């Protein structure tokens, strides 16, 4: 694994590059208030099993960043995602690109489908926010009522981000956890519907990958994602 920086407008973000083959690259987007270290176990497994290279970024305000995450907007994090994707295309011009996002990172990955073309989309417990939240400072986002609107089918059916999902031309996989405290089944069901996605169900799991699930269940979870990525 190599540590590197991705240049953005006027600053840079940290990233880890897992080197596999040159023909496939996976962009990995972590969740809110998380970091690239949290993605190491799953990413290492996918690199070993599929032969893909992988780039794991760390948003501004996360990890060792000097910025305050609460003073950053999701829109700024999305520009960082764009910069990372474009770095991949520059460094691996002939590679098949896949994107895997977890929770907030899943929300970012879905935003990316509007602006960049890629082959595979993996959404692990993907979050969703109100349209105005995308341009709000994180400190102004009402996180106390997130689950309420994520369970609201009218909200989900009218959300512009989901309305344009059908234009995505690649494959999609949605991973959902039975006991998720933050992303309810209504949200993951809607993502499955709009992307015509395959799905993987983690019975008894809460939101975080770091659960009390038995080791064999964790291995099955990782293998399911790996096997899906290896499909053509």
PLM-predicted stretches and their roles:
Residues 47-66:
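Conserved alpha/beta-hydrolase
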Residues 181-187:
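Conserved alpha/beta-hydrolase "acid-adjacent" motif
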Residues 168-169, 174-176, 180:
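Short beta-strand/loop motif that positions the catalytic acidic residue
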Residues 32-45, 186:
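The serine-hydrolase catalytic nucleophile loop
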Residues 205-218:
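Catalytic histidine-centered segment of alpha/beta-hydrolase-like enzymes
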Residues 111-151:
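Hydrolase active-site cap/lid region
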Residues 1-19:
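N-terminal cap/lid segment of alpha/beta-hydrolase-fold proteins
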Residues 38, 72-91:
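Alpha/beta-hydrolase active-site loop
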């Amino acid at each position: 694994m190599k540590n590197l920086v991705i240049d953005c407008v006027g600053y840079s973000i940290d990233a880890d590059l897992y080197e596999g083959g040159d023909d496939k690259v996976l962009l990995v987007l972590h969740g809110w208030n998380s970091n690239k270290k949290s993605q190491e176990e799953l990413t290492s497994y996918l690199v070993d099993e599929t032969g893909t290279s992988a780039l794991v970024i760390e948003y501004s305000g996360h990890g060792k960043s000097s910025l305050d995450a609460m003073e950053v907007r999701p829109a700024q994090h999305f520009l960082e995602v764009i910069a990372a994707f474009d770095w991949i295309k520059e460094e691996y011009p002939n590679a098949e690109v896949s994107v895997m996002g977890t929770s907030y990172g899943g929300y970012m990955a879905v935003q990316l489908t509007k602006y960049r073309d890629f082959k595979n989309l993996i959404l692990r417990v993907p979050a969703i926010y109100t349209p105005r939240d995308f341009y709000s400072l994180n400190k102004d986002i009402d996180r106390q009522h997130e689950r309420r609107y994520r369970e609201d089918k009218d909200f989900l059916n009218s959300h512009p981000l989901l309305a344009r999902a059908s234009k995505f031309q690649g494959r999609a996989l949605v991973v959902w956890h039975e006991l998720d405290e933050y992303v309810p089944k209504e949200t993951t069901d809607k993502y499955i519907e709009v992307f015509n996605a395959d799905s993987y169900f983690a019975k008894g799991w809460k939101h975080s990958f770091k659960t009390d699930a038995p080791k064999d269940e964790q291995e099955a979870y990782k293998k399911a994602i790996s096997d899906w990525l290896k499909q053509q």
